[in-house]
Structure formats: C-alpha cells, structure tokens
UniProtKB/Swiss-Prot annotation:
SUPFAM superfamilies the UniProt entry points to: AbrB/MazE/MraZ-like
Compartment annotation: Cytoplasm, Nucleoid
Protein name: Transcriptional regulator MraZ
Origin superkingdom: Bacteria
Family: Belongs to the MraZ family.
Residue span, SpoVT-AbrB domain: 5-51, 77-120
Pfam families, alphabetized: MraZ
CDD domains: MraZ_C, MraZ_N
Main localization of the protein described in the UniProt heading: cytoplasm
Taxonomy of the source species: Bacteria, Pseudomonadati, Pseudomonadota, Betaproteobacteria, Burkholderiales
Length: 142
C-alpha cells in the first residue's frame, strides 16, 4: 500500500526519482516495472505493473458508451521501468497532458500513485478544503 505525499523535481530529461520508501515495494511488487497514464482530474496515474493489469482489465470490460474513457486510460498508457537510480521517465506527451514542468507531487493512493504538477495540486487541494467535507465524510470519525 502506497501512501504519503512527496515533493519532487523532474530532471531535464523528464525523469522523476521515486522516493526510497517506495522503491523497495515497487521492486518487490513489480520488479521496478510501472505504467503511467492520464487521469481525468489533470494528473497522471502511476501503477505497479500487476496493479495496472488489474485496472486495464476492468477498463477494457467497460461498455461501448465508455469507449472514450478506454481511449484516455489505455490509449495513453506508457509502460516504463525504474532505472538503477530509482528514476522513472515520464514521456513528453504525458508530461504535457498533466502540465508537468519541474516541480511535481507524488501522492500514494493505496494501490497506485498520482503525479501532479505541484502548483496545480496545491490549488486544487486548497479549493477542496475551502468547499468543506463532502457528504460521504460527514459521519466519518477522526
């Protein structure tokens, strides 16, 4: 299970260093193989390959009225491998789609990660906090 937020920088080649606390898990779970794809909220999804295979199967099984979503998730997917330094190369097309420039946020979301442009994430988080808790969390005890 992946959790936590990490402020990271992309290098000049568009590579992102996976934090050391997640590298070992990605090596054990997926031998360093991950898949990146677009997310409709404007970020990227980063899956360990076994989790991606499960997600891909679920997306492929969607009915025809969701065909564009199949294109978005599956048609933009990029399989990559962590290099020896624990970096993942984010393709230029995916960097552009998520408006990733230099500063990014990597968010552990349980079975996968989200990769956000840092400024976009900060603005969306602030907006969500200003709107207050959604109904689904009203009775949630902390």
């Amino acid at each position: 299970m992946f959790q936590g937020a990490s402020a990271l920088s992309l290098d000049a080649k568009g590579r992102m260093s996976i934090p050391s606390r997640h590298r070992e898990a990605l090596q054990q779970q997926a031998e360093g193989r991950v898949t990146l794809t677009k997310h409709p909220d404007g970020c990227l999804l980063l899956f360990p390959r076994p989790e991606w295979e499960t997600f891909r199967t679920r997306i492929a099984a969607l009915p025809m009225d969701a065909h564009w979503w199949k294109r978005i998730f599956l048609g933009n997917a990029a399989d990559v491998e962590m290099d020896g330094a624990g970096r993942v190369l984010i393709a230029p097309e995916l960097r552009s789609a998520a408006m990733l420039d230099k500063e990014v946020m990597l968010l552990g979301m349980g079975s996968h990660f989200e990769v956000w442009d840092a400024a976009t994430y900060a603005a969306k988080e602030q907006q969500a906090m200003a709107q207050g808790m959604p109904e689904a969390l009203k009775n949630f005890s902390f």
